[in-house]
Amino acid sequence: MKIRAISLGLALTMAALVRFEAGFETGSVWGLLTPAEAHASSESAWAQRPSGDQLRRLAHLEPYIRYFTSLAYGPEDARVSADYIRALILTESSAHAHARSGKGARGLTQIIPGTARIVMKKLAALSYDFLYIDEDVFKSFKPEDLYDPALNILIACYLSATYHGWYDGSTELVVSAWNAGPGAVARYDNEVPPYPETRGMITRLKGFMAYLGEGNVN
């Protein structure tokens, strides 16, 4: 099967960015970049070694990670870094597909159902035949569907694509938007918000990326 690019445009104002807190309000995906900055910052971070159990769980997800990160997003046919998605999964859930936070975020990358519903509408509009995804889920999405590893990873790639486009591939700002929301990033003039949880997540994710970047996961 030849994988074609998903080309989507993005028209977004700063006001819309601030209103984005609860999910997609306007626009759609830009190209998902694998920025040199991400790799440079990863190399300078202390590598954080996952546990053996984490690595075993992550290994079972490889077909989904490799497939969804092989899809090209946007007019530049850019692709998401597989190591970024692996690191996001390790950071958010320790690769537990049925993880759930006290705030209701679910699945491997801890996605809020409200945000997922908006993304699902965007994905449904593409009429794209994704592998590993039952097309009926686009018509009748339920919060528990976020426990499906393939769907969770697809949504994570789509969301991350938008953030990478907005923040020119800055790992720190992409993670800040993921954790605290784009509105928080905007309130602090496109700087990392001074939230301990957000800054801790950035450190952990970059640590996992540094470990993965050493070629420790095939």
Provide a role label for each language-model segment.
Residues 4-19:
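Hydrophobic membrane-insertion alpha-helices, especially the h-region
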Residues 16-29:
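Membrane-interface motif at the C-terminal end of an N-terminal transmembrane signal
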Residues 31-96, 120:
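Export/targeting segments at the very N-terminus of extracytoplasmic proteins
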Residues 47-56, 72-75, 97-105, 139-150, ...:
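Second-shell loop/turn segments in exported
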Residues 60, 79-84, 170-173, 196-200:
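Alpha-helix N-cap and coil->helix boundary residues
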Residues 77-96, 110-111, 154-157, 174-179, ...:
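Short, functionally critical alpha-helical segments immediately adjacent to catalytic or ligand/cofactor-binding
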Residues 92-123:
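Conserved alpha-helical segments that form or flank metal/cofactor-binding pockets of metalloenzymes
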Residues 113, 117-187, 200-201, 206-210:
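Alpha-helical segment that forms one wall of the substrate-binding/catalytic cleft
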